[in-house]
Regions:
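A short, structure-level motif marking secondary-structure boundaries and short turns
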Residues: 33-35, 144, 179-181
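Acidic, glycine-rich loop-and-beta core segments that form the ion-binding/anion-interacting portion
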Residues: 166-195
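Alpha-helix capping and helix-loop boundary segments enriched in small/acidic/polar residues
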Residues: 40, 145, 149, 182-186
Length: 195
């Protein structure tokens, strides 16, 4: 019998048939089979990692699991800092995010978040975090600018910020493909290619 709360098991019966047996098996598995990814592996983790790698760009060979998006973004910041320290570039630590972007609510991830309510009363954003224009054409484009011109405007603003800060100090840019918390904002066509 699976070791899980009865309520959870009863909810599993309402899940699609293909999913529920696997979920019941996971709930009945020892915690090491699902939780301790640094010291143990499991069939479930190997299968999920394989599926993720099927979607990943060529050259990517590893999957890192975090507990949340905030945790994942915090880890990325640490990796950026570590990488530049190892290469002897301790000044290359600045990260550019976007206004209205959401990356978490911790000290660093809250700093990357481009929403003032996440900064108020917490002395955020932290040093080294900058915010560039949000790709919301309807609200952020100068009057009379079409979407194509706005894409160029966003890319130019980012480049100006990098040059103003000093390319030798800017380590990364972070942005969600589709901005959710900041207002369900879909960037105009061509935005990511320009960025």
């Amino acid at each position: 019998r699976p070791r899980a709360f009865g309520e959870i098991i009863s909810r599993l019966t309402a899940m699609p048939p293909a999913l529920s047996p696997k979920m019941v098996t996971l709930f009945g598995s020892p915690p090491k089979d699902t939780a301790f990814r640094f010291t143990h592996s499991s069939e479930a983790i190997i299968e999920l990692s394989s599926r993720i790698m099927d979607w990943a760009p060529e050259g990517m060979k590893k999957v890192y699991y975090g507990l949340s998006g905030s945790d994942a973004n915090e880890t990325q910041v640490k990796l950026v800092r570590y990488y530049n320290n190892v290469l002897g570039r301790p000044q290359k630590k600045k990260i550019i995010s976007r206004d209205r972007g959401y990356h978490g609510s911790g000290i660093m991830t809250g700093s990357l978040t481009g929403l003032p309510t996440f900064h108020q009363h917490f002395d955020l954003p932290a040093e080294g975090v900058k915010h560039t224009v949000c790709p919301h054409w309807y609200r952020k484009a100068p009057v009379g600018m079409d979407e194509s011109a706005f894409v160029s405007y966003c890319a130019d603003e980012l480049e100006k910020m990098i040059l103003a800060e000093g390319p030798h100090t800017v380590a990364a840019f972070i942005g969600e493909p589709l901005m959710g918390t900041g207002g369900i904002i879909v960037p105009p066509a061509g935005y990511w290619a320009a960025i």
